[in-house]
């Protein structure tokens, strides 16, 4: 059906709704790209339909929910010669891109360890997530967390550090171990929203994942959407000659010789890596390696 945006006929748009409305949208021959921003479980079926109909696809994270779906998207993209892009916005944050450029130019030496996270207290948002119907009291996201264990939203933290470590550009993830706390807040949320006792809430309030790569690098990823604390994606790179950190304090740590080797002249005589470099040096480094 057509709806007016209030500014005349020129702003009329065709609206496709319902569980399968996207199928009709994907059949149109005047659309080049389908942008998918639904609940997680609908990302894959909408993307699959779009690719099968010859459309380029841009998918909010996560792009798929299991390995089978991941490979199917790869195969469909290659078969139909259409782009299929995961929209991991955190890879394109200014600090991350600036720091990636530094890492690729050897400012930190060899990056051997990296940290990333999605730590975001969703207390103000749980009640606003889409619900399937009147009987759905939890909303899609809380329901998914209740049914699944582990880091269910890893790419905000993982994407930027994977780039810095050249994952699939000379290295690969090889070994993974994850550990979580018990669920306390999750169970309380079910009781609060569904008015029933929750005996099983699979997602721990805080999950920590350690990954070792084939080249001996280590990645630590954290996930916590339950407990009260400041928003934090960590983003930390540990190199053999330098250090970068975004949350909670943005800064770089290099000694004087490494800063000189990176093309920036220190303004202080005793610059070392025991603390973040002074603002003047940091500004000069950042400007030199603008992405």
Would you name each region that the model predicts?
Residues 13-31:
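A structured beta-alpha segment of the ubiquitous adenosine-cofactor-binding alpha/beta core
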Residues 1-11:
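Single conserved hydrophobic/aromatic residue that forms the stacking wall/gate
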Residues 185-204, 212-213, 241-291:
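C-terminal glycine/acidic-rich active-site capping loop/insertion
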Residues 221-232:
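Glycine-rich phosphate/pyrophosphate-binding beta-alpha loops
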Residues 10, 33, 39-40, 44-92, ...:
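Beta-strand-loop-alpha-helix segment that lines the small-molecule cofactor/substrate pocket
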Residues 83-85, 90-201:
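Predominantly a Rossmann-like dinucleotide-binding segment in NAD(P)-dependent oxidoreductases
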Residues 23-26, 47-51, 74, 100, ...:
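Non-transmembrane alpha-helical segments in soluble domains
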């Amino acid at each position: 059906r057509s709806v007016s945006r209030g500014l005349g006929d020129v702003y009329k748009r065709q609206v496709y709704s319902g569980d399968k409305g996207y199928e009709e949208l994907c059949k149109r021959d005047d659309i080049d790209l389908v942008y998918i921003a639904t609940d997680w479980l609908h990302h894959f079926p909408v993307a699959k339909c779009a690719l099968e109909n010859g459309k380029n696809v841009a998918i909010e994270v996560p792009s798929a929910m299991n390995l089978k779906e991941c490979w199917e998207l790869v195969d469909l993209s290659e078969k139909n010669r259409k782009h299929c892009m995961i929209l991991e916005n955190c890879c394109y944050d200014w600090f991350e891109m600036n720091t990636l450029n530094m890492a690729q130019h050897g400012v930190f030496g060899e990056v051997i360890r990296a940290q990333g996270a999605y730590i975001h207290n969703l207390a103000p948002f749980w009640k606003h997530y889409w619900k399937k119907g009147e009987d759905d009291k939890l909303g899609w996201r809380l329901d998914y967390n209740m049914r699944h264990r582990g880091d269910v939203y890893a790419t905000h933290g993982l994407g930027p550090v994977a780039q810095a470590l050249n994952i699939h550009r000379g290295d690969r993830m090889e070994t993974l171990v994850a550990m979580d706390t018990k669920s306390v807040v999750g169970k309380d949320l079910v009781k609060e929203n569904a008015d029933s006792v929750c005996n099983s809430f699979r997602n721990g309030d805080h999950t920590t994942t350690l990954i070792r790569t084939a080249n001996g690098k280590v990645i630590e990823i954290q996930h916590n959407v339950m407990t009260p604390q400041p928003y934090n994606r960590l983003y930390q790179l540990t190199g053999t000659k330098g250090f970068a950190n975004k949350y909670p304090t943005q800064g770089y740590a290099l000694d004087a010789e490494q800063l000189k080797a990176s093309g920036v002249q220190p303004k202080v005589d005793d610059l070392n890596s025991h603390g973040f470099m002074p603002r003047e040096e940091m500004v000069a480094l950042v400007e030199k390696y603008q992405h």
